[in-house]
């Protein structure tokens, strides 16, 4: 007799990321931005959005300190306002956003945001979600 395994919250997030990536990625976000994948690191409880920048945004030399800080604020504001990411924010996940150049392949930007950054107090423990 096979045992019944109830999928944990973390397992569900990892599976949903794999399914989303397989079904929708690469996904054009705008003319210069492509979402290449969503992944979830269970031990680190980190949800990663990996993007590829192209066109005028793919230039490595564009990303100076001031541009990096401005982009960080934009990405964080988008995270704070995101309704689709609400269940993951409520669970207190860390979000990683990484951007690569379509031209050089180099990593251009990388941001990590914790509940403290995006202003969310976890409403439940992920281990207890049924």
Residue ranges and their predicted role:
Residues 4-7:
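Bacterial signal peptide processing site
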Residues 10-21:
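Alpha-helical transmembrane signal-anchor/signal-peptide segments
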Residues 30-39, 81-103:
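Short glycine-rich, low-complexity/disordered patches
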Residues 40-90:
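Mature extracytoplasmic domains of secretory-pathway proteins
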Residues 99-130:
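C-terminal partner/receptor-binding element of secreted or periplasmic proteins
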